[in-house]
Amino acid sequence: MKVDLISFQDKAVKDLRVDIADALDNYRKRGKTQVVSLQAPTGAGKTIIAAALIEGIYNGMSFPDGTAYAEQPDAIFVWLSDSPELNLQSKEKIELKTSKLRYGQCVTISEESFDMEMLEDGHIYFLNTQKISRSGKLTTLSDTKDYRH
């Protein structure tokens, strides 16, 4: 990260990383899925916390207590929000504040240009909820998109 995290942000990153590792372990052992979420008050730096977490997952991370997690360069993240403007703001902040993400690793999913059957490994996809509604173009078949097998 290009910025130093405040102690409560560091703690949030570690707590989230532990929760994600536990969720992945539960999925692998039992096939059980679960949601891991970040909740914090306005101005607490949720985007910075999430950016540090994502950067740490891609590149590996260790903590002062000796806890360490291997890199997961093929992880896929979907950044979901209600508005395209908020997605753009979040994407720009992540690109500005992280130091280890590659150029092009952050991808905005738009109805006009997105044409993939599956998301590619190692990317952060920014998507707003309207695009995946029942009437959204991303959830319907068309003459140019048919990924049924």
Each predicted region: which residue ranges?
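RecA-like P-loop NTPase motor core of helicase/translocase proteins
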Residues: 1-149
